[in-house]
UniProtKB/Swiss-Prot annotation:
GO terms for molecular function: pyridoxal phosphate binding. HAMAP family: PLP_homeostasis. Belongs to the pyridoxal phosphate-binding protein YggS/PROSC family. This is Pyridoxal phosphate homeostasis protein. It comes from Helicobacter pylori (strain J99 / ATCC 700824) (Campylobacter pylori J99).
């Protein structure tokens, strides 16, 4: 059985070391990616003071939210959002959508937000590793797309950027994908959230300026 307290304490120790090396004033938030975890495991981490959890699929988000509605949790949608799932996502009122990957999707979400009278906070996903398997706008188009969404959408509110580190063992390539995203982030006025770093590369992401981490297997893998 997992020792939940030990897992999260180990994670926090590693994050603290990387955070202080980057800047003593830097604040880093953990989103525990619970896509393969049971509600019981989430409850254990809640008991360890973890509050933000992320899901890859809208249906899983709905199931977890309903089964744990007695807890004051903060839910994030981190996986790709299909257009036919927009209404379902908006009805759940997540804290943040990490995976807004195009102007087209933004306009469709904005339209549904208007109809339903709700707002949605989101991050623009940047495909900073230029990988065909990944969603997101390419870095060269990121600032213009961000600006277009910000100017056009009133209920869909952009809060910053998200990227997935390059899928490789070459640390320099992973670092480049993070620094590329950080440079874009620094050029966006009022952007506050930089979601970079997962279980295998979060320390490198923090060194590149990440302030929100998406941690799954480090916390939940048996």
């Amino acid at each position: 059985m997992l020792d939940y307290r030990q897992r999260i304490d180990t994670l926090i120790t590693k994050i603290e070391k990387a955070r202080i090396a980057y800047s003593r004033h830097h604040i880093v938030k953990i989103v525990a990616v619970s896509k393969n975890a049971s509600p019981e495991a989430i409850q254990h981490y809640y008991n360890c003071s973890q509050r933000a959890f992320g899901e890859n699929k809208v249906q899983d988000l709905k199931i977890k939210m309903h089964s744990l509605e007695h807890l004051p949790l903060e839910w994030h949608m981190i996986g790709s959002l299909q257009e036919n799932k927009i209404n379902a996502l908006l009805s759940l009122k997540p804290a943040l959508l990490h995976s807004l990957d195009s102007l087209k999707l933004a306009l469709k979400i904005e339209k549904r937000c208007e109809i339903l009278g709700v707002n949605l906070n989101a991050l623009l996903q940047v495909n900073s590793a230029y990988e065909e398997s990944k969603s997101g706008v390419v870095p060269e188009e990121a600032l213009e797309t961000y600006s277009q969404i910000s100017e056009t959408c009133k209920r869909l509110k952009l809060k910053g950027l998200m990227c997935i580190g390059a899928h490789t063992d070459d640390e320099t390539k992973i670092e480049k994908s993070f620094t590329t995203t950080k440079k874009l982030f620094d050029q966006i006025k009022n952007a506050s959230v930089l979601s970079m770093g997962m279980s295998d590369d979060f320390e490198l992401a923090i060194a590149c300026g990440a302030n929100l981490l998406r941690i799954g297997s480090f916390l939940f893998k048996e």
